[in-house]
């Protein structure tokens, strides 16, 4: 346990950030899973709408500092390839 006052405050702040980041990451996983299931079922329309939603959530995660921009770009590229292959 921290003895320094500022470190005690940082522990609280870090815990809030961790919970917020986990929520964002969970939404991302759900969105990407939706794209993958639409691709597996060969539903072009559903895959396209899920791709737009997932891309948006990836961009938001970057702006919130949850993901690095290159990581998001790689993920968007991977799911786009799957959708375009339909």
Swiss-Prot record:
InterPro entries: Ribosomal_bS20 (IPR002583), Ribosomal_bS20_sf (IPR036510)
Gene3D superfamilies, per the entry: Ribosomal protein S20
GO CC, any one term: small ribosomal subunit
Domain of life: Bacteria
Pfam family, one: Ribosomal_S20p
An example Gene Ontology biological process: translation
Swiss-Prot/TrEMBL keywords: Ribonucleoprotein, Ribosomal protein, RNA-binding, rRNA-binding
GO-annotated molecular function: small ribosomal subunit rRNA binding; structural constituent of ribosome
Sequence similarity: Belongs to the bacterial ribosomal protein bS20 family.
Stored PANTHER family: 30S RIBOSOMAL PROTEIN S20, SMALL RIBOSOMAL SUBUNIT PROTEIN BS20C
HAMAP family, sorted: Ribosomal_bS20
Function statement: Binds directly to 16S ribosomal RNA.
Protein known as: Small ribosomal subunit protein bS20
Protein source organism: Pseudarthrobacter chlorophenolicus (strain ATCC 700700 / DSM 12829 / CIP 107037 / JCM 12360 / KCTC 9906 / NCIMB 13794 / A6)
This protein's encoding gene: rpsT
């Amino acid at each position: 346990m921290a003895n320094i006052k500022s470190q005690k405050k940082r522990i609280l702040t870090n815990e809030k950030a961790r919970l917020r980041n986990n929520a964002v990451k969970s939404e991302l996983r759900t969105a990407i899973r939706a794209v993958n299931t639409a691709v597996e079922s060969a539903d072009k329309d559903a895959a396209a709408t899920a791709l737009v939603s997932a891309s948006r959530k990836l961009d938001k995660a970057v702006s919130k500092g949850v993901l690095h921009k290159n990581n998001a770009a790689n993920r968007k590229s991977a799911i786009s390839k799957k959708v375009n292959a339909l």
